[in-house]
Amino acid sequence: MNSILGLIDTVTNTIGKAQQIELDKAALGQQRELALQRMNLDRQALNNQVEQFNKLLEQRVQGPIQSVRLARAAGFRVDPYSYTNQNFYDDQLNAIRLSYRNLFKN
């Protein structure tokens, strides 16, 4: 009688463990999906931040350049080699963009 009860107990434990393994597998699958969704959302958020950063940077750069153009159009003499030079700002903008892109590469 004890051997039959022991056998039933062993089978019950084995089935319970098998069910727990299946539940763990399902939970891991769901966690993986959630992790992938979270990674995609993080990537989208980073892309949005990069776009906002680029827009802000272009506004800051284009402001002084536009001021120089307006000053020249108004007849003022503007030093072409000053820090407001177009090439200087383009170089700075490209350098910052490249470093920012490299920071968030996949």
UniProtKB/Swiss-Prot annotation:
GO cellular component, one term: viral capsid, decoration
Subcellular location per the Swiss-Prot or TrEMBL entry: Virion; Host cytoplasm
Family of this protein: Belongs to the vesivirus VP2 protein family.
InterPro entries according to UniProt: Vesivirus_VP2
Originating organism: Feline calicivirus (strain CFI/68 FIV)
Quaternary structure annotation from Swiss-Prot or TrEMBL: Homooligomer. The portal-like structure consists in 12 copies of VP2. Interacts with capsid protein VP1.
Alphabetic keyword roster: Capsid decoration protein, Capsid protein, Host cytoplasm, Virion
Miscellaneous: Translated by a ribosomal termination-reinitiation process from the bicistronic mRNA coding for VP1 and VP2.
Main location: virion
Biological role: Minor structural protein that forms a portal-like structure at a unique three-fold axis of symmetry, following binding to the host receptor. The virion attaches to feline junctional adhesion molecule A (F11R). Once attached, the virion is endocytosed. Acidification of the endosome induces conformational change of capsid protein thereby injecting virus genomic RNA into host cytoplasm. The channel formed by VP2 may allow the delivery of the viral genome through the host endosomal membrane.
Protein name: Minor capsid protein VP2
Swiss-Prot/TrEMBL domain comment: The N-terminus domain points away from the virion surface.
